Amino acid sequence: MMEESGIETTPPSTPPPSTIGTSVAASTSAIFTPVPPVLSSPLAAPAFSPLPSFAQSSFSTPVPSSVPPLRTSVPLTYASPLPVTSVYSPPANTSVSAAFSSPLPAFSSPPSFPPPPLNTTPGPVLTAPPMNPPVGGFSMSSTYDITKGHAGRAPQTPLMPTYSAAPVTVLPNPVVQAPIAGIGSSITFPEEPEDPRVHTMHDEGSAGGIWGFIKGVAGNPMVKSVLDKTKHSMETVITTLDPGMASYIRTGGELDIVVTSIKEVKVSAVRDAFQEVFGMAVVSGEDGQSNIAPQPVGYAAGLKGAQERIDSLRRTGMIHEKQPAVSVENFIAELLPDKWFDIGCVIMDDPVHGIRLEAFTQATPVPLEYVQQAQNLTPQDYNLRWSGLSVTVGEVLERSLAHVSRTDWHVAFTGMSRRQMIYSATKALAGMYKQRLSPRIL
């Protein structure tokens, strides 16, 4: 049907190749793209596939009239008879003069140039611009300007370079390298003599393993002393901030003591004293009866009252017959003519070990007038008159003096409380008791 409509169906054929002597007129409106002949080269003979042809109207840029006709009769000049293995595609309407001595028309298809004749004089040799930074072992297989397209700067990665890797030297790490011998500080410090006990401890630890080391540390007297001081310091800090914590920290152990009173002034003083001496002790209070006058008079009455408190608890079954007990009893005594003093008696009774100890607090002076008032207030027919008075000295002082308590009037006369007096005497008693006990019990 295409033949009937008058349209030719013959495909366009490739225009015949133009010869080298053909000239292009200045008034031509389009540049014909000739296919240059492929010449055989003794060095390299690349094979090219047929190039596609373009229509005559594919280029519309007119050639200026000032351009003279191109002549290709001048022999081409090459820098070196190297085989052309790369294909260059320069832009259109640009004269290539990097490797030729005469201007050539711009090609739209990659040209293939024949090798130069043997009698051709070599032209000036163009060398590649120096690289920055220089790289050892760099070689170029072409004279192509690699700085083209990079504003005159050498690209970071050249297009077709081949590198020969330089030997890599591994630098030593400055952090781990050993210091240079012979270089030292001008400042010297005196060396302390080594303690032989430390070496002995380390030798025992290494010989017996970890348990031997622990045993050696635990058996070192210096370590024991440091640990004891540290423990004591911590307990002191805790008990200073909160005195009530002392009974919880030091309560425990095998030592169990009962105080024959429920008054805190007596129980707390005995507890602190025994825990101070033994480290840990269980101290509790039970209400024991003295069965003597409220205000004992004389040492014998004081001792009788303290012992009666212990016996009353054992008779009633409040404590075991073999239970160690501590009893405190205060009394007055005329140590000098018309000189009366208040004294506290502290006794320790341990039937299991057969230990009985007595101690006394410091003597607190009592004015004679207050003692006489207590004697006058006691009836003559008082049945316990043999042991003392029915009215205590503390009651008389509380009635006579303002801001004075019957239970702790000692601080008003001496500046030292009754509790501190009992604590001091009981601490001495606990020290004697510790010396009497067998080492296996401790």
From Swiss-Prot:
One of its GO terms (biological process) is epithelial structure maintenance. It is found in: Golgi apparatus. Keywords: Golgi apparatus. SUPFAM superfamilies: ITPase-like (SSF52972). GO terms for cellular component: cytoplasm; Golgi apparatus. The keyword DNA damage does not apply. GO terms for molecular function: protein kinase A regulatory subunit binding. Residues 1-24 are annotated as: Disordered. Belongs to the PRRC1 family. This is Protein PRRC1-B. The lineage of its organism: Eukaryota, Metazoa, Chordata, Craniata, Vertebrata.
